[in-house]
Curated annotation (Swiss-Prot):
The gene is ATM1. The chain crosses the membrane at residues 143-164, 187-210, 260-283, 285-305, 372-390, 406-427. PANTHER family: ATP-BINDING CASSETTE SUB-FAMILY B (PTHR24221), IRON-SULFUR CLUSTERS TRANSPORTER ABCB7, MITOCHONDRIAL (PTHR24221:SF402). GO terms for biological process: intracellular iron ion homeostasis; transmembrane transport. It comes from the Eukaryota. It comes from Cryptococcus neoformans var. neoformans serotype D (strain JEC21 / ATCC MYA-565) (Filobasidiella neoformans). This is Iron-sulfur clusters transporter ATM1, mitochondrial. Gene3D superfamilies: ABC transporter type 1, transmembrane domain, P-loop containing nucleotide triphosphate hydrolases.
Length: 734
């Protein structure tokens, strides 16, 4: 319940009570809360204090300045539409089929109460370790200091009604000409002001002290989650849509902020304040006042929890629609060129609108159920307040209570209204935060299919010999890629892997790099099974230029330096020269400071590939893997780049593997391995394979040779332009 408006009815009038009492006209206390507090639980929103920094929740101390009857009202606010998608996400990749279903980020399914309670407590226990770490006395000191300030603030807050009571009783006497306010109630007024100021001061100090504790916990959990995701295998990332994944992580980290602040600064202090008020009412005015208060608190809390549990289903549905909307929007924006190329803007908008409709439907349910919750809370508290005023009025009539006592009762009850109102909001947000964090912690609990074995040792390279021994692998059980693949790549030699599309050429690298693990067989490097060595040492020993070049939304200098973050600028420049991309970079307006755009969309495919080559040359690993590294280059640039690469490899003893469709680029390889239907169909040098009429390699070579004799569209266009230039010169001469 929030109090946003009040009626200006005076509680007392002259002559209505014994003695001479001046008319007290109450001033409306305007409390402006944000839409999150008024609306209760707008989707995706948090209490305003939490968004500023954890540990700061709306103040309890600044309550009502004068006695008044308040008509309570709460503004309804429909949940906001889904947050705009962040277009800087990594592109989603069509998932490979998997026998193990991925952990869903959809939180719309109801969870059994007992199971959910266990999950909630396990989440809280994990967070407790972050706010009370074993080997960090500084954090413990801050937590103790924050709790001390909290208790001190609550004790002072309860004193405010007592000062108010004393002021009213002091003024309820005959007024003479010599009487002044300071004579009658000066000390009480000063105490009233001091108590309110100190309550606010202690609250702000508490927030400042606890802020670093909460932020440190958030940073630690967020870092652990991000690190865990980076350590997951490729199958995990291919099966998940980036938009929904990042949205779930974002909500989970925000949930940490709310839970830490709400438990420490709302749940505990609210219970403390209710206990203190019930004790004071019982001690000062009897059990009936305390009984009404206790019953009201229990009924209010029970109603809020039950109603919120019913409304949680709608929140889950809205979250599921929000995740889906983010995924659809990110996919569409990332694939902007495809959308425009096929004129499918209306289709993409319709897809996004479908998710918005689902979100809208769930949001309407949230808003309408919120009205029922607000009405019930208002009725319960208003009924209790009426009963308390009735008991107080009877006490005044009987002479057992003074006017100040009535003021005291009224103020104590109203002081409970704020924590109770926030308790409802906190409970609603607490439940949602636990749901969001459950999804995030489930991500942390997933195991990677490819990870170091307990006995893994660093890879010791001797020459770089690679052997596939009876390897079987399939992305999907019904479509095996390799059945019994065996071949050996000699150390220090240039080896090419060729074959028809879909024969598994790129899969060789994915298995070697342990993006995936083979289902059977062994992959050896210098006689060491790659499953028995550490992933870090394995991947540091291999450099790759992938078929689809991944670039960051940063400048060219950073994208090349990513191969070796410790490299100097001069080393980066040298790698660019070796990759035959230095001239292109120098022609750009900002040269190495030029931004390449998201996924490198602001530069050509050939430039992206040359940057990737420069990056791997900067890494300078003993084993190099080129997966269609020159497919986007013109013949001249390709020839120059391959000449540079060959010169780098010459005499350095590096093992290099080239996957290529253009067979002329690998005709000088020491060994060519031809794959077909999951097996090694042929292997040998270029000359040996051509000497095998009817062979796979011979057929591929003849097909490309025939194709190369036909003029390309670019060559036809160039010839046409040359003819036009000749014709123009003839016209000028005539």
């Amino acid at each position: 319940m929030s109090f946003g408006s009040c009626s200006r009815h005076a509680l007392f009038t002259p002559g209505a009570l014994p003695g001479s009492f001046r008319t007290m006209t109450t001033s409306c206390v305007k409390r402006v809360y944000t839409a999150q507090i008024r609306g209760g639980d707008a989707l995706g929103k948090r209490l305003p204090s939490v968004s500023s920094f954890p540990g700061q929740l709306p103040r309890h101390g600044s309550h009502f300045q004068s006695l008044a009857f308040f008509s309570t009202s709460r503004r309804r606010q429909t949940p906001p539409p889904p947050s705009p998608p962040t277009t800087s996400q990594s592109p989603t990749v069509p998932s490979k089929a998997s026998t193990t279903p991925p952990t869903s980020l959809n939180t719309s399914k109801p969870v059994a109460t007992e199971s959910q309670d266990k999950t909630d407590w396990s989440i809280i226990a994990k967070l407790a370790g972050n706010i009370w770490p074993k080997n960090n006395p500084n954090v413990k000191f801050r937590v103790i200091g924050a709790l001390t300030l909290l208790v001190a603030g609550k004790v002072l807050n309860v004193q405010v009604p007592f000062f108010f009571k004393t002021i009213v009783d002091s003024l309820n006497v005959p007024i003479t000409e010599s009487t002044t306010v300071w004579v009658l109630a000066g000390a009480s007024i000063a105490g009233y002001g001091a108590a309110r100021v100190l309550t606010t001061l202690f609250g702000e100090l508490r927030n400042a002290v606890f802020a670093s504790v909460a932020q440190n916990a958030i940073r630690k959990v967020a870092r652990e989650t991000f690190e865990h995701l980076l350590n997951m295998d490729m199958k995990f990332h291919l099966e998940r849509q980036t938009g929904g994944l990042t949205r779930a992580i974002d909500r989970g980290t925000k949930g940490i902020s709310f839970i830490l602040s709400s438990i420490v600064f709302h749940v505990i202090p609210t219970a403390l304040e209710i206990s203190m008020v019930c004790g004071i009412l019982s001690w000062k005015f009897g059990w009936d006042f305390a009984a009404v208060t206790a019953i009201t608190m229990l009924l209010y809390t029970w109603f809020t929890i039950k109603t919120t549990a019913w409304r949680t289903t709608f929140r889950k549905q809205a979250n599921a629609a929000d995740n889906k909307g983010a995924t659809v929007a990110v996919d569409s924006l990332i694939n902007y060129e495809a959308v425009k190329s096929f004129n499918n803007e209306k289709y993409e908008v319709a897809q996004y609108d479908t998710t918005l409709k689902a979100y809208e439907k769930a949001s309407v349910k949230i808003a309408t159920s919120l009205a029922a919750l607000n009405s019930g809370q208002n009725f319960i508290f208003s009924s209790a307040l009426t009963m308390m005023m009735l008991l107080g009025a009877q006490g005044i009539v009987k002479g057992t209570m003074t006017v100040g006592d009535l003021v005291l009762v009224n103020q104590l009850v109203f002081q409970l209204s704020l924590p109770l109102n926030f308790l409802g909001t906190v409970y609603r947000e607490l439940r949602q935060s636990l749901i969001d964090m459950d999804v995030m912690f489930n991500l942390q609990s997933l195991d990677s299919a490819t990870k170091d074995s307990p006995t893994a040792k660093p890879l010791h390279l001797k020459g770089g010999e690679i052997e596939f021994r009876n390897v079987a692998f399939a992305y999907h059980p019904e479509r095996p890629i390799f059945r019994d693949l065996s071949f050996k790549i000699p150390a220090g030699q240039k080896v090419a892997i060729v074959g028809p599309s879909g024969c598994g050429k790129s899969t060789v690298f994915r298995l070697l790099f342990r993006f995936y693990d083979s289902s059977s067989g062994q992959i050896l490097i210098d006689g060491q099974d790659i499953k028995t060595v550490t992933l870090d040492s394995l991947r540091r020993s291999i450099g790759v230029v992938p078929q689809d070049t991944p670039l960051f939304h940063a400048d060219i200098l950073h994208n090349i330096r990513y191969g070796n973050l410790e490299a100097t600028d001069e080393q980066v420049y040298e790698a660019a020269r070796k990759a035959h991309v230095e001239g292109t970079i120098q022609r750009l307006p900002e040269k190495y400071a030029t931004k390449v755009g998201e996924r490198g969309l602001m530069i050509s495919g050939g430039e992206k590939q040359r940057l990737a080559v420069a990056r791997v040359l900067l890494k300078d690993p003993p084993v190099l893997f080129f997966d269609e590294a020159t497919s986007a280059l013109d013949v001249y640039t390709e020839t120059e780049l391959m000449r540079n690469i060959n010169s780098i490899l010459t005499g350095q003893g590096k093992t290099s593997v080239f996957i290529a469709h253009r067979l002329r680029t690998i005709s000088d390889a020491d060994l060519i391995i031809v794959l077909q239907d999951g097996y090694v169909a042929e292997q040998g040098t270029h000359e040996q394979l051509l000497a095998m009429p009817g062979g796979v390699y011979h057929g591929l070579w003849q097909a490309q040779l025939t194709e190369s004799t036909q003029p390309t569209e670019e060559e036809i266009e160039r010839q046409r332009e040359e003819l036009e230039v000749v014709d123009e010169k003839k016209k000028q001469q005539t």
